[in-house]
Amino acid sequence: MKIKTLSAISLTVIPSLILANFCHPFPSSQANSTGESSIFNGELEEGAVIKVLENDTAISKGYFAELIAAFNEAYSDYNITAVDANTDQYVDLANDGPYGYGPDVLYQANDVIMQYAEDQHIYPLPVEELDAYDTTSSAAWKAFEVEKDGTTYTCGVPVNVQTPMLYYRKDLLPSDWQENWDDNNNDIPDMIETWSSLLEFSQERHAENSSQYGYMESLYDSYFSSGFLFSYGAYIFGDDNTDTNDIGFAAGDAEKGAKIIQQLASAMNEESIDDTITTSAYSKLADGTYFATMSTPDVYSTFLDELIKAYENEGKSEEEAKELASENLVMVSLPQLPESGDLTDDSSELIDTKTMGGVNGYAISAYTNYPNASLAFINFATSYENIVKRYEMLGIVPTREDVVKEIGGVTEVVYENLENDNIVLMPSNSAVSQIWTPTQTFFADITKDVFRSESDKKYKTNEDLKQGLEKVTQQISDAIHTLE
């Protein structure tokens, strides 16, 4: 791959005083006499060894090894080497960085990166000069932006969109689905188009064989279940996710979304209350116990590998197994919901399902000794060629529009959902950490309620669900503001 000079990648317009107030204070030796920052001056630090933190899937599937090998070859003339940071993917940069144990470059979700930015542990970046700048979704860039003293800074470089997707087995569809499960005659199974049909199919499949299920999901998981609330008017924080005094999990008709969760749970078992399904979904989808589940695009390769193994265990050759798995494992955007909020209402208008989502990307630690070499690595890793390879090996949904147009299909649909605000991005502030426990507790409780006896049920009406969501909102507010 051709190396492009990074001499143009500089921060010549940002006074060091502003930067010092925003991110980790820069040593005085890194500020020039005119008061301009020279952190990113394009002068590659020869001999640099860049510690890069990647996610576990990229490492286990071999993508990361190929990436750093290619980078090291491309930058061998500078004696610059990228290595695996060899730390947990959830490393605590705030505590590790100052002591030299943290990575130079980290790949994380936008909410994690921006919490580091808020606490001054990563650098704002001169992103306009990166190869990916003009081709990357504006919504994705926004996920890494923060305003300080009237100036907008970007503290991360987007790589891929994370959002819930429906995974299903095409070979587990009923043989007569085109006659009995395609009401609008569009050659798409009804159970893939609407949650109402998926619930009906799930009930029928389990009735025919009590050991098998249709759609299965860990409903307690806020990341996957919050979208049902958002679809009916809920939100996380007001003012574009910046006003933590305005918490919106009970807003609009959010209780309809909570009711949807309960209706879906009625065709599952009690494993839907906790994370059991999250951990078993790969093997259960592969062995046919589940017809469908919900997960994120970046684990497509894991589902695929499990299905390949299942076919091989049935006696298929490796080549046959791979071909069958690629054909029968399908990842699509989520089905539509009834506007009425009742999955048994066949007459209702349909609405799109909104989802919680995030943007994963790269950032640079404020504690690195090699900012320019680190920026060179990010520029290399987010190039067209390497994002295509990341897609091919991991099944991600890229944030580069040129790659998305090349791939097409469901990837393009997800990209459009991001641009059209059907993906509700996780807030880029520290307050987001307070939403998980109250919402997970609520989702687990309303799911468990489905399996309680009638006399023990806590949520018998939509009003009960509304009151439960209002309590969740208060709990989040208390957690955010009590110690202020």
Task: Label each residue range with its predicted role.
Residues 388, 401, 405, 418-484:
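Conserved C-terminal helix/tail region of periplasmic/extracytoplasmic solute-binding proteins
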